[in-house]
């Protein structure tokens, strides 16, 4: 009987500790009190290890070590650029990271002198690095498959200066596909005809 009572008390204490731990993650603010928002950049494949590293890099959590320990072994996270708002709880952060609801990146660029400059900008803005972007932008076989037949020295003209919304996890190949669509949208038949009348080329 005494052993049963001791076991019951032990289980009650353990349950209370787990409940308190869960309540704390469901009610306390995740961000530091001096921040209104912060961005968490979770690299692929989006496992707990990548989330933990993102939290370390962010330096924006009130109790980063506690959060890192809490998500150890958890799964279902998705890579991306996530906006963490003041007032969000650790539990809400976890749910956001599992939802995949990224905050898009606003990309703005002027006409670039060469593709290396543009690739450098892209490497600073997105998950993929500049080398991957440059390779995709100069992949003549892939460009031909998209109907683009330009010489290497003509390729910078393919990337129309403007503002674009893209996800941080955008693949270099999908970025190039988007730019081809924007190029064709810009150089519509009317604009092409006007350029020809003025003696200009695309």
Task: State what each model feature region is.
Residues 2-202:
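Conserved catalytic or metal-liganding residues and their short signature motifs at active sites
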